[in-house]
Structures are given as structure tokens and as C-alpha cells.
Amino acid sequence: MAVNTYSMKKDWNKKVSAHFSVYEFACSDHSDTVLIDTELIYILEQVRAHFGKPVHINSGYRSPSYNISIGGSPRSQHCLGTAADVTIKGVDPIRIALYLASMPYFQKRGGIGYY
């Protein structure tokens, strides 16, 4: 696992994979720093390929102060750049969660929630 650090000022439109850019993972508090895990990007690309539709990132990286302000867990993986809340238009969240749960990565570690 490698977590890369990006700057919204310098890297906002930088592609981190074929279908994702830095700005999609940016914190809602408009902070400059964005942390993104390379494994997370790989997983999101697999999800996109599986469902054949774009993946929308509702929440990616969260600065610690923003995470506190929204009542997030003090140990939130979002603050480490290793988590994302996503939706796919026309796909029930439970289907996304079940697909993720079937991946070897999540059979070893990690957590999946849906709402």
C-alpha cells in the first residue's frame, strides 16, 4: 500500500488512474492536501469495470478537522486516504457492497458499509 500526497493547488486535475482525478478525492473543507491510497484507486477501477458504469466518489480524503466536524470516527480511514464512500447511478448500494466483499482484499482486511 502506498498513499500519495497531492496538492489541490497544483494537482487538482491530475489523473491518478484511467477514470479518476485528484479533485474527486478532495476534502469538502477545501483543504489543499489530498491523500490517496494506490490500492483504493485499484479497487475503485475494478468496481467500475465490474459494473460497467462510472463510480461517483461522495467522500474520499477527509482532513482530521473536517472529519471531527462531521462526527466521523477518530480512527476514520478517510483521514489516511484509504477509504471512499461511493455511488454508482442505477446500482443498489448493497450490490456494490456485496461485490466488494467478494474481493480478496476485503477478505483479509478493511471494512465495507452501505447506506
Give names to the regions the model predicted:
Residues 1-50:
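Extracytoplasmic cell-surface/polysaccharide-interacting catalytic and binding patches
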Residues 4, 21, 59, 64, ...:
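Intrinsically disordered, low-complexity segments enriched in small/polar residues
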Residues 29-30, 55-61, 93-100:
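N-terminal start-of-chain detector that recognizes signal peptides
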Residues 32, 52-53, 72, 88-92:
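Generic structural signal for short, solvent-exposed loop/turn connectors between secondary structure elements
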Residues 36-43, 53, 66, 82, ...:
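Amphipathic alpha-helical interface surfaces
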Residues 41-71:
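Extended, low-complexity, intrinsically disordered C-terminal regulatory tails
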Residues 75, 80-115:
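Catalytic cores and adjacent binding grooves of peptidoglycan-active enzymes
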